[in-house]
Curated annotation (Swiss-Prot):
Pfam families: DHHA1 (PF02272), tRNA-synt_2c (PF01411), tRNA_SAD (PF07973). Its EC number is 6.1.1.7. It is an enzyme of class 6 (ligase). The keyword ATP-binding applies. The keyword ATP-binding applies. Catalyzes the attachment of alanine to tRNA(Ala) in a two-step reaction: alanine is first activated by ATP to form Ala-AMP and then transferred to the acceptor end of tRNA(Ala). Also edits incorrectly charged Ser-tRNA(Ala) and Gly-tRNA(Ala) via its editing domain. It catalyses: tRNA(Ala) + L-alanine + ATP = L-alanyl-tRNA(Ala) + AMP + diphosphate. NCBIfam families: alaS. This is Alanine--tRNA ligase. Binds 1 zinc ion per subunit. Consists of three domains; the N-terminal catalytic domain, the editing domain and the C-terminal C-Ala domain. The editing domain removes incorrectly charged amino acids, while the C-Ala domain, along with tRNA(Ala), serves as a bridge to cooperatively bring together the editing and aminoacylation centers thus stimulating deacylation of misacylated tRNAs. Belongs to the class-II aminoacyl-tRNA synthetase family.
Amino acid sequence: MYMSTSEIRTAFLEYFRSQGHQVVSSSSLVPHNDPTLLFTNAGMNQFKDVFLGADKRAYNRATTSQRCVRAGGKHNDLENVGYTARHHTFFEMLGNFSFGDYFKQDAIKFAWGFLTEVLQLPKERLLVTVYATDDEAFDIWEKEVGVPADRIVRIGDNKGAPYASDNFWAMGDTGPCGPCTEIFYDHGDHIWGGRPGSPEEDGDRFIEIWNVVFMQFNRQADGTMEPLPRPSVDTGMGLERISAIMQGVHSNYEIDIFQALIKKAAEIVGTSDLSNQSLRVIADHIRSCAFLVADGVMPSNEGRGYVLRRIIRRAVRHGRKLGATEVFFYKLAAELAAQMKDVAAELIAQLPLVERVLRIEEEQFVRTLDRGLLLLEDVLANLGDAKVIPGEVVFKLYDTYGFPADLTADVVREREIGIDEEGFKAEMEKQRARAKEASSFGVNYNEMLKLDFETPFTGYKTLTERTRVVGIYKGVDEVSGLIAGDEAVIVLEQTPFYAESGGQIGDSGTLKVDDGIFAVTDTVKAGKAIIHKGYMELGTLEKGAEVEAVVDGERRQAIALNHSVTHLLHAALRQALGEHVTQKGSLVGAERMRFDFSHFEGMTMATIRRVEELVNNQIRANHEITTQLMDLEAAKSAGAMALFGEKYEDDVRVVRMGDYSTELCGGTHAKRTGDIGFFKIIAESGIAAGVRRIEAVTGKAAIDFMHQVGEQIEEAAALVKGDQFCIADKVRQVLDKAKMMERELEQLKAKLAAQAGNDLLGQVIEIKGQKVLVAALEGADPKSLRGMLDELKNQMKSGVVLLATSGEGKVNLIAGVTNDLTGKVKAGELVNLVAQQVGGKGGGRPDMAQAGGTQPEAVPAALQSVHSWLEERL
């Protein structure tokens, strides 16, 4: 019985709905609150906390069709996609789950009922496996379901350790685990392969279609198994695999949804070979890429974004291999949305964004793709008998041409050649070391000073503190005291000075002692100690002395305003551009702030104005800015935004600005958003692929900036004899007039060139009966030379012309040959003859060529050589 992929998905969910299960929508491909996972890769991911007892749902039976990605991380099918019948980066996992409700008997009967009654698969084509010691499951299959014993296979510990088996599932080294039973479909003896557990089990005859996991134990640290108080069930069946069976095909790529994508891809790139493996790759990759972007992942050079970038670039490379000459990949997203319209509401809603992101990423990559492939072809041609591409070549392709290592591996795999992965990793480590060294400006106190001391920070509540000097260092040497003029770093018992971290620069101020002042120019961290950099401005200072630490309050306030506005800006960017925006870095100073964020294209002027408006609205709302210490998980549950890649303590500081922004942050902030006063973006630019940078000012600095802009506008208005309200029209008038004058100048030059050409005709000589003109001119530019050449050739009808002009250390040359003589004399050869003698080079067509040089003094002799050269050829 044929069923479409969509019909199978619907039938599965409706079957389990009828069995009392709650139909739960697919969760995002980006796992929430699970840092152990790169992507959602199984149906149970969204229920993990339920299985662990940390979450409780209103239902105890659930069913889903979960979108999954397996690329990068522990589960990575990327390198096999396109080369096998069943590997994918993206697939749908059909599943039914019991949270302490039914167990083995019902789970087995549900699975068998769906396969044999709803899908009507022949029972004789089905074979099952159970864990070797799971007699309960074996008996249910044989005695209650009626599967013959010879079609039930016991699988023991086949992975080298107790409970390490294809038929024993575990969430980790400890925790919930249990045996599983798997259902296989027998394609028939005309397909090579053996039963599960046999030496030929890797063949394609018996294909696993459903895995039913019985979570009944809690594995302890010592390896012992304790029964779970509420055994549960987790099942998974690949939609693509069961669709292949129901549609009577052997490869997943032959099912309806893949065939539609393959045909569309073939149409776009212009190929008729529908069996080409590259079409399989493209059809698979558009599914993972489109849904990842729809779920908020953007191409980048780290984490999930880098996996997405690798998949996109692999697809683009296969498109070029098929002959694509223009960007094509993004055009498949609409076809995918149409094919999966029943379950792709998120993709359909985000389709314009998805297409734009994929198009921009492809456009960026194709600029270097062809050059990288040429380099790789050159390396392959000179590889000889070697079967491995050197690591330094793989690194160069990555670093210079944007080739992920697995893309290079994919290219050379087609030649049965591998890559030196260890060599590549070594080159990457060298690059990281170089980057670290290059970024270490000034003194690295973390390296210099190994201080076993944690400085309490009191600066959230006060800007002055009576405290004691516990350490004075000049370089790496601890000293007992300082005199006027000494530069040093000082460690205090406790301090109100904020040390540079989280993008916020360190405080400055003074340390006052009875007979001296130490000027603090910067505050940084050395381990957990806070150190105060500066110099002894007056008097002396000794270790152990009591000092009054005074932070520069005006500077701290300016920094606080700029830090607070980064939070508002982050929220505004997510509102204006999309939830994919995340902070990539920041620099919060007293004069201005800088904010780096993930986004795939430059912001338009209208979008910049929109972001400014959103931020200034929140400033005018004058929200109270509150801080609270919370448990990390509680903070995340409360909606606090954590920065990707940042390490946080168990207790974190949560900064709230009304209902608009909630972030984890250890920096200093204003008391209310209104204190910021005014926010103005002064620059927006790209700093890396997929990363944008905004520079902005606040408060008085923003007002000063607007005054400067106003002054410049007034000055410009005066220059064009207008005012600030009509300056654009006035500038337009000036530009229009300038263009008109340029046209008149060009016309005048053309007339002068024609006149000069007529004057030059008097210098024409004959060589072997052919007209020849070789002349040096004063003050003519290259464009004028071209006009003169055309006029002279028209006047001469037949002949050879070489003109030269020089000035300011440069030489311009042009040669022309009428068509009847290009068989004897080539303009390109002639102009190069002269160019080589005047320190230059050039080229062009047989009838016209241009060149440049750097030795004006050599022009006369070079022109003299032309006559003898022509005599040999005419």
